[in-house]
């Protein structure tokens, strides 16, 4: 199954190409990318009902909307800081359930495969991984907050 990063790369490649439509099917998962008239890519994905984790549909939004991130985002200027961004529009959850503790907090050590949060989109819960080894420096969003595509969620000091 494709992960969020691979889907994002496909969207970018299709958006920059002359291809109008792309369809991917594998193991019961169907992904359809189709350009609208304005040249933006629309993503439609149908996931199987059995798995708990599934990729949610996502729409590519203009880069200008990324600037709409909250003013609380004041990243420390350090070349080793990596931003973990939201791969989709949805609701940010710091833990797997209301009773559970957060996946990570400031000071938590993470590796590339560490789940740092969940972003819910259309009743599908998508686990977001750190994708870098290091230490969480700052959590930039609140639990239950609506997040935009590309919005920074965490700052990680990369090792």
From Swiss-Prot:
* Segments for region (Disordered): 53-77
Q: List the disulfide bonds.
A: none
The Biotinyl-binding domain extends over: 81-157
**According to its UniProt record, in which pathway does this protein act?**
Lipid metabolism; fatty acid biosynthesis
**Example of a GO biological process term:** fatty acid biosynthetic process
Instruction: Give the record's keywords alphabetically.
Output: Biotin, Fatty acid biosynthesis, Fatty acid metabolism, Lipid biosynthesis, Lipid metabolism
The Gene Ontology terms for molecular function here are: acetyl-CoA carboxylase activity
* Compositionally biased intervals (Low complexity): 53-74
Q: Where are the transmembrane segments?
A: none
What InterPro entries does this protein's entry cite?
AcCoA_biotinCC, Biotin_BS, Biotin_Carboxyl_Carrier/Decarb, Biotin_lipoyl, Single_hybrid_motif
Q: Report the residues modified as N6-biotinyllysine.
A: 123
Q: Which Pfam families match?
A: Biotin_lipoyl (PF00364)
GO CC annotations, alphabetized:
acetyl-CoA carboxylase complex
Q: Which domain of life is it from?
A: Bacteria
Complex and partners: Homodimer.
**So what does this one do?**
This protein is a component of the acetyl coenzyme A carboxylase complex; first, biotin carboxylase catalyzes the carboxylation of the carrier protein and then the transcarboxylase transfers the carboxyl group to form malonyl-CoA. Binds biotin.
Protein name, per record? Biotin carboxyl carrier protein of acetyl-CoA carboxylase
Organism this protein belongs to: Bacillus subtilis (strain 168)
Instruction: Supply the source organism's classification.
Output: Bacteria, Bacillati, Bacillota, Bacilli, Bacillales
């Amino acid at each position: 199954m494709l992960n969020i990063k691979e889907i994002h790369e496909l969207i970018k490649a299709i958006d920059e190409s002359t291809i109008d439509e792309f369809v991917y099917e594998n193991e019961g998962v169907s992904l359809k990318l189709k350009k609208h008239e304005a040249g933006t890519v629309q993503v439609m994905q149908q996931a199987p009902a059995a798995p708990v984790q599934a990729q949610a549909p996502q729409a590519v939004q203009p880069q200008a909307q990324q600037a709409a991130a909250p003013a609380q985002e004041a990243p420390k200027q350090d070349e080793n800081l990596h931003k973990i961004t939201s791969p989709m529009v949805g609701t940010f959850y710091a833990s797997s359930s209301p009773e559970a503790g957060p996946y990570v907090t400031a000071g938590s050590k993470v590796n590339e495969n560490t789940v740092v949060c969940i972003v819910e989109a259309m009743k599908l819960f998508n686990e977001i991984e750190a994708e870098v080894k290091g230490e969480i420096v700052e959590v930039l969003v609140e639990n239950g907050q609506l997040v935009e595509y590309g919005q920074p969620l965490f700052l990680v000091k990369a090792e």
